[in-house]
């Protein structure tokens, strides 16, 4: 199968693929793997949800004191990976991470369900806990604390924008003769290269 659609700008191509994924994936086409690395070079990955994207980059939100938050603080680079099984496609993105503005983070936090807002305060993300009741008690405590009031965004919870420097588009084809297109940012322009599968 040949992919006919070509783009000079990889963000345009991502947008086209993502819109197709939203129609064909049964749930969460915005799910992506985020891979980071610790100060001593230990890699780690986890699934998160992309909350926005544009020409400036790809945005997700997290507890900045979590493992990924501390790794990003020490090494502000990451790799994202989208895989859409229904389309037999994946997109791999590499780049540098930058914090979103407080205003942008506040707007998104305000849009979250109240339970998720409480959860952001209640969970000491990535830290050990004795048992599940510790989390339940923390949720109950913060539910009571914020009863009848607007919940503000925690200072340790915000968004990160990955500014892409490379994107690889992978399309499954017969006999493992897959199509691989890599876009790399050179100066202010994108250069596209085809790779052997």
Language-model segment annotations:
Residues 1-197:
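Binding-site signature for planar aromatic cofactors or substrates
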